[in-house]
C-alpha cells in the first residue's frame, strides 16, 4: 500500500459494524469528513452495495478504517479488486473491542490522529 503523495481528495471506507470498534470507525470517518472537507471526498460503509461503492470510488484514493482484525471493509474492497492506499485497524491503534459499547471521545480522536499520521507519512 502506498502513502498519499498528492493533494487528491480521499475516500474513506469503514467497516461500520455493530461492535464498539465498528461504531468507532464510522464516527471517526464522519468527523474527518466534517473537519476536512477539502481532503476527504466522502465516506462509504462496507455494508453498502458493491455497485454503489464501485461507482463512488471509481479509481479514487481509498483510506480504509477497519475496526478489528476481521477486516470487513478491506475484504469488501478486495471483492471489487480495489487496493486501499492506506489501511488502519482500530484495534491495532490501542482500541479494545468490547461488545456494543459506544465509542468514547478520546478513542475517536486517537483514531483520527492515526489516519492523519498515515496520510502524512
Spans of model-derived segments:
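Iron-sulfur-associated redox domains of electron-transfer enzymes in respiratory
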Residues: 1-121
